[in-house]
UniProtKB/Swiss-Prot annotation:
Species in which this protein is naturally found: Geobacillus kaustophilus (strain HTA426)
One GO cellular component term: cytosol
EC number: 2.1.2.10
Name of the protein described by the UniProt record: Aminomethyltransferase
Record key words, sorted: Aminotransferase, Transferase
Catalytic activity, as annotated: N(6)-[(R)-S(8)-aminomethyldihydrolipoyl]-L-lysyl-[protein] + (6S)-5,6,7,8-tetrahydrofolate = N(6)-[(R)-dihydrolipoyl]-L-lysyl-[protein] + (6R)-5,10-methylene-5,6,7,8-tetrahydrofolate + NH4(+)
């Protein structure tokens, strides 16, 4: 039986087409993926991301506990700030990537990938020492994401809180948005400015309807996972199971900025990740742009000089760039910009170039 978010009953009214994703029945699109993608790049789009997992970490030992498990330096956080980080195995493979919100002293909220929530909770629980309390609050929490250049303007119509005061990766808790108490965070997964809002599950439908109504004059669209994927892909934001996995390290995936091997507290996977940062990883995530006609898809093999050198992690025809592009994990010695490679597409080896990433970066 697939899980459903608190907004499932709203989908039908919005014309959603649903699919299975990580054990959830989720909307892949409402109008079309291209329309929704364009709405976020040019105006704003509203996503239901209530399938994501939320785990509360409290207790006097919280910081030491998180420092031991996280690649980033959690000690740099302050109340009201969020941080992107990862958890790794001893061999450097990735348990998950996540956001940490520091709500107060010894009070943290972890937001993890939907398909990994149970695995992550078990991993965290297995490493608890001292005064640390874990609580999985996923089922009672809803998460909406309003993303795009018009996001601040639209959301400001619903709250007296000054959203301009929120910098990227900062948040405020207990903000009243159209009568609903929410944690409002200036974060997202699209490459655009925007906000993620966490509220009680029972308040989600009212908040969803209020945001869409407030955004009507800006042509804000409800958006599904299809557009969320093409948007994050153009911005080269990783998806667990594709750019990250238990056999792909954060350094290989180009996420070394979130791996603080010099922090005082040793963390799981530190030795391998430190070596990869210092000596270079065996593989690197690169961008590829097709020369021949064809679309690189997840799992397609990549060749250089007749030798298999890696595989495509994500690929599509970019709605913004109108090009057939992909991300690929390849041997480090072939990961040079301008290098010609071949992608095996349905038994044919088609030419592509390695190109700079991210494919898309919004104008500041």
């Amino acid at each position: 039986m697939l899980k459903r978010t608190p907004l499932f009953s709203v989908y039908a009214r919005c014309g959603a087409k649903t699919i299975e994703f990580g054990g959830w029945e989720m909307p892949v699109q409402f109008s079309s993926i291209k329309e929704e993608h364009e709405a976020v790049r040019t105006r704003a789009g509203l996503f239901d991301v209530s399938h994501m997992g939320e785990i509360v970490v409290r207790g006097r030992g919280s910081l030491a506990f998180l420092q031991k498990l996280m690649t980033n330096d959690v000690a740099k956080l302050r109340p009201g700030r969020a941080q992107y980080t990862l958890m790794c195995y001893e061999d450097g493979g990735t348990v998950d990537d996540l956001l940490i919100y520091q709500k107060g002293e010894n009070d943290y909220l972890l937001v993890v990938n939907a398909a990994n929530t149970e695995k992550d909770f078990a991993w965290l629980s297995g490493h608890v020492e001292g005064d640390v309390e874990l609580q999985d609050v996923s089922s009672e929490t809803a998460q909406l994401a309003l993303q795009g250049p018009a996001a601040e303007r639209v959301l400001q119509r619903l709250t007296d809180f000054d959203l301009a005061a929120l910098r990227p990766f900062s948040f405020a808790d207990g903000v009243e948005v159209s009568g609903v108490k929410a944690l409002v965070s200036r974060t997202g997964y699209t490459g655009e400015d925007g906000f993620e809002l966490y509220c009680k599950a029972e308040d989600a439908a009212a908040l969803w309807e209020a945001i869409l109504a407030a955004g009507a004059r800006d042509s804000v669209l409800p958006c599904g996972l299809g557009a969320r994927d093409t948007l994050r892909f153009e911005a080269c934001l990783p998806l667990y199971g594709q750019e990250l996995s238990d056999s792909i390290s954060p350094v290989e995936a180009g996420l070394g900025f979130a791996v603080k091997t010099e922090k005082e507290t040793p963390f799981i996977g530190q030795a391998v990740l430190k070596r990869q940062k210092e000596e270079g990883p065996p593989r690197r995530l690169v961008g590829i742009e097709m020369i021949d006609r064809g679309i690189p898809r997840h799992g397609y093999l990549v060749f250089a000089d007749g030798e298999e050198v890696g595989f495509v992690t994500t690929g599509t025809q970019s709605p913004t760039l109108k090009k057939n592009i992909g991300l690929a994990l390849v041997k480090a010695d072939v990961a040079a910009i301008g290098r010609e490679v071949e992608v095996d597409i349905r038994g044919k080896r088609l030419k592509a170039n390695i190109v700079p990433i991210p494919f898309y970066r919004r104008a500041k």
